[in-house]
Amino acid sequence: MGKIIGIDLGTTNSCVAVMQGTQPTVIENSEGNRTTPSMVAFTKTGDRLVGQAAKRQAITNPKNTIFSIKRFIGRKFDEVPNEKKIAPYEVVNEGGEARVKINDKTYSPQEVSAMILQKMKQTAEDFLGEKVTEAVITVPAYFNDAQRQATKDAGRIAGLEVKRIINEPTAAALAYGLDRKQTSEKVAVFDLGGGTFDISILELGDGVFEVKSTDGDTHLGGDDFDQKIIDFLADEFKKQEGVDLRNDAIALQRLKEAGEKAKVELSSRTDTEINLPFITATPEGPKHLVINLTRAKFEGMCSDLFDKILEPCRRAVKNSKVEMKDIDEIVLVGGSTRIPKVQALVKEFFGKEPNRSVNPDEVVAIGAAIQGGVLKGDVTDVLLLDVTPLSLGIETLGGVMTKLIDANTTIPTRKQEVFSTAGDNQTSVEVHVLQGERPLAVDNKTLGRFHLGDIPPAPRGMPQIEVTFDIDSNGILNVSAKDKATGKEQSIKIESSSKLTDAEVEKMKEDAKVHAEEDQKRKEEIEVKNSADSLIFSTEKQLSELGEKIPADKKPVIEGALEKLKDAHKNGTIESIKGAMDELSKVWGEVASNLYQAEAPGADAPEGQAPQDGGSKKGGEGAVENAEYEVIDGDGK
């Protein structure tokens, strides 16, 4: 008997998860992403593209690229006038049903949805290494029977036996683990996705969860916010240039992508610039679209959508017979809940901060996987002695990951290491906490970042910054950085640091093997450049300090070698940098031996090394590793 997978068939993105032992795992697709665009495209050569591949070519192939098909599934043609109007692909009436016409062939929404489900099925099969035939698929709580049945039909077309169709808010409640709490609680699940909105009030206790009421709007979601921006951009451009971009399918698709991007940016910024060069052309020449959009403007033009969100909330609370003050938690689900105004409305309406503990893009699929585990009988309460599956460390100079805790270390565990600054008078350091096996920080998973400031100005290599990693028996990672001179400390708590999917773990390990040679070369380049930088710094410092003590005939030679190294460091190859370093070290070594003899800082340095202030060696007592801060003790690495 194979696994029962859980699929969130979303309007904008879809996600698939499965139970691995007692834990749900979100499965990465073939592109390495945890969510897959719910898009299907047909090329001129007859190829069918699904997911990210379809999204990448949407701008150049808008009429043959299908998105937001969930808005059509289970609906009659006359029920989707607005959706039909804004879709760049052709929607036709076939027996009263909405169909999509591509290259003289019509497809039902169920068929298109099945193509997306097949992609999710294949993703799961690639991950599990076995055939998958059963699934739990989620739908909006406010989906009607026709939409539910159509979704089930899509599963059948995709070769899946749909064991259960469950509501997205119910799945979200499972995923958040709220049903496992011992005390009775009342919870509101607020689900605003790409095309639909649900609000459900649930009562949970003793592993039983009961839906008290549900409400929503199957015509309200992130697509509608995107459309507001699209209309704004089209209207502004028409005012400026007298051209309506809505009549150009390719321009319209570019507006759609720009609108979605602007919406996302406005979740973290107060304004954004939409810049679309060569958006169209007139007899006068090419035209470019450059428009600034503020968050306030965005919120103003979406005010009617925000109002539409509140009404279902009022109805749901009223119908649940639950007093507002008795609702214990508000769970946010769906990517559109990242919009700041939405979060503010939720807080204002319910009178408390919403729960943001799980990724809103993945929570529904996780819940579906848990439901699959329940149906399979695999979900049981198991206590495990855990280990950290991947190495933990921080980013150091040149983007290198310096490990503090190795993979498969039994927890609880604690590790300390001392670092220093990499620049003179550096008054703060950023601690970038990483997890993974790759040598470079960029290739590993970021767990968090924090800053330690107010470090007294001092030459580089002098301050001592003690970084501590502490993982308790619950798998909760605490990272702290302390300036040993001042006692000032900063810390960050990273919960579930080991909560990577098995897919992520295996992908990182495989990447580490496949890219080992490339990684090693890149790491060597960084190390050589770091060494060259240190040699340049120490040479300039010694030239300045020693001044006239350096023989007149030797000083130009040293300066020439120094300039050669600087040029190689800036423009040369690794081999040329090494050669220039050797040349400078040799020249400097001759001078240093005459000046300092045995007691000189660099007299006994190994070949290729010059006297260094702080250095970049690693391993022995007192060694320092150049970082944004530098290792200066011998513990561990």
Curated annotation (Swiss-Prot):
Stimuli inducing this protein: By stress conditions e.g. heat shock.
A GO MF term: ATP binding
User: What superkingdom heads the lineage?
Assistant: Bacteria
* Acidic residues: compositionally biased ranges: 627-637
Question: PROSITE patterns per the record?
Answer: HSP70_1, HSP70_2, HSP70_3
User: Which residues does the record list as Phosphothreonine (modified residue)?
Assistant: 196
Which region ranges are annotated with the description Disordered? 598-637
Xref: SUPFAM superfamilies: Actin-like ATPase domain, Heat shock protein 70kD (HSP70), C-terminal subdomain, Heat shock protein 70kD (HSP70), peptide-binding domain
Q: Does the keyword S-adenosyl-L-methionine apply?
A: no
Q: Which UniProt keywords apply?
A: ATP-binding, Chaperone, Nucleotide-binding, Phosphoprotein, Stress response
Q: Which HAMAP family match?
A: DnaK
Recorded family membership: Belongs to the heat shock protein 70 family.
Q: What does this protein do?
A: Acts as a chaperone.
Protein name as annotated: Chaperone protein DnaK
